[in-house]
């Protein structure tokens, strides 16, 4: 057992450091932390737009009242289980929640929310995300010690911003960091 103090990051946002993670799915990624315990962690990348889908056809919603396609962006939440879909959304929608974070955000993963969004009865803000990111026990803590991630409080404006390409840059600005001056030689005090 380690003598290190465990800090629960559930409900926080991880910001990939600009020069340490230089390629792949985590390069310049933002991850909303769904769960972080001593057994491991799970999060959703929310700035990797991969496509747009029609909710009606994707979820096979059988309702003649919806005549036009309801197009929504689809985000890649991580490298694990791409067949699983999640709606990260504002907490104004509270039917059959998978997770409620009590910070104005919630997660749903059911057909009902897709139908409600298609009918205009869903949450005010939502992202449809497939797959997720997971860490085994101690793995995220090691990555944090290596300065692969910065941690910031949840910010709904970043999560639901219209331009996914600018979310990471805006998160750095919010933290008071200019990417140009960010050193690849990071140490611990």
Curated annotation (Swiss-Prot):
For this protein, the record's PANTHER family field holds: UNCHARACTERIZED PROTEIN YQGE (PTHR30327), UPF0301 PROTEIN YQGE (PTHR30327:SF1)
Q: Which domain of life is it from?
A: Bacteria
InterPro entries given for it?
AlgH-like
Q: Which HAMAP family match?
A: UPF0301
Name this protein carries in UniProt: UPF0301 protein A1E_00140
- Bridged cysteine pairs (disulfide): none
Q: Which family does it belong to?
A: Belongs to the UPF0301 (AlgH) family.
Q: What is the source species?
A: Rickettsia canadensis (strain McKiel)
| Membrane-spanning ranges | none
The record's GO CC annotations read: cytosol
């Amino acid at each position: 057992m380690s003598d290190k103090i465990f800090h629960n990051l559930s409900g926080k946002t991880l910001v990939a450091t600009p020069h340490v993670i230089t390629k792949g799915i985590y390069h310049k990624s933002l991850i909303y932390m769904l769960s972080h315990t001593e057994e491991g962690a799970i999060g959703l990348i929310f700035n990797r737009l991969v496509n747009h889908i029609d909710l009606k056809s994707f979820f096979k919603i059988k309702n003649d009242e919806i005549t036009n396609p309801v197009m929504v962006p689809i985000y890649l939440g991580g490298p694990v289980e791409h067949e699983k879909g999640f709606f990260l959304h504002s907490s104004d929608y509270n039917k059959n929640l998978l997770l409620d974070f009590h910070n104005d955000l919630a997660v749903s993963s059911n057909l009902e929310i897709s139908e409600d969004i298609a009918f205009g009865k869903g949450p005010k803000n939502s992202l449809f995300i497939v797959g997720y990111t997971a860490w085994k026990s101690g793995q995220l803590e090691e990555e944090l010690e290596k300065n692969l991630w910065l941690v910031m409080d949840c910010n709904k404006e970043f999560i639901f911003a219209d331009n996914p390409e600018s979310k990471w840059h805006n998160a750095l600005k919010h933290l008071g960091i200019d990417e140009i001056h960010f050193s690849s030689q990071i140490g611990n005090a």
